[in-house]
Amino acid sequence: MGLISSATFGLIPLLSIPVLAQGVAEGTVLMYRFLIAALIVGSIVVIRRESLRVSWRSFLILLALSVLYFFSSFLLIEGYQHMPSGVATVLHFSYPTFVVLLMFIAFRQRINLLQGLAVLLALGGVSLISGFFESDVTAIPFRPLLTVLFSGFCYATYIVILRHSRLEPMSSFKLTTYVMGLSTILFALFCKATGSSLVLDNTTQWIYTALLALIPTVCANITLVWAVQRIGSTPTAIMGALEPLTAVVVGALALGEELSLGQGVGIGIVLCAVLLLVMSPLLTRRLKKV
């Protein structure tokens, strides 16, 4: 389920960039994305005859999760305006590193030697992806770079809170309904504050937005919650390796995006860092037996 979640998340550029290219504001696209998703998942909750009632404490936790999801999704889609979507997605994919660091800071979960090496590799890969060692023509501006990295940090915080908060037990459908519904309200308020139009002008925009809501939102979030609740936050983040791969392939084949040699190497290094994180528990146990 974690792999399915990551692969479907990787389709966000394919379904959002064509709408953005027609002049629709980022906040408007995301508002409709989450509105349609909330209606779909909410209908499932009703069919399952599951109560939507939650305690005030759980509601506040859900609101916090929604705020994190608001920033994560908005900052990522904002990054698409300043760099290839595949690069933006790989930078966002720094979130497994943030998960490991947050688990260490908040819960004193040890970072072993292999995990530390993976974190350093990830940082090196991000440096290459940003164009730090290349000419100014190919380098990614510092502010957009920080923007997308912060989207990854917000997403990592979302994963950790989802796993370790005192949120009352609930199905992934109910949780997703709340997060998507509250995110819709946040984006509606954001559009109102920024003066963005709330209108989608044509059928093409509606089709892309509906698919954006269904595939990388409904399917991806339900499988993400399912994975986090059953296997934990760190393994779920690590299995997200398929997300940047999907985005890079989609960007190259469907959107005509090009990568520099350094960025390609950087992507490979980040993925190696993730694989090292995946293998670190097994390798650590084997090394202890030697």
Which residues does each predicted region cover?
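Helix-helix packing/entry segments at the starts of transmembrane helices
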Residues: 6, 32, 88-94, 161-184, ...
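Glycine-/small-residue-enriched transmembrane alpha-helix faces in small-molecule transporters
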Residues: 1-28, 32, 75, 137-164, ...
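Hydrophobic transmembrane alpha-helices of multi-pass small-molecule transport proteins
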Residues: 41, 63, 102, 111-133, ...
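Membrane-interface helix-cap regions at the ends of transmembrane helices
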Residues: 37-57, 124-139, 182-205, 249-253, ...
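Juxtamembrane helix-entry segments on the extracytoplasmic side of multipass membrane proteins
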Residues: 23-31, 54-59, 131-154, 192-211, ...
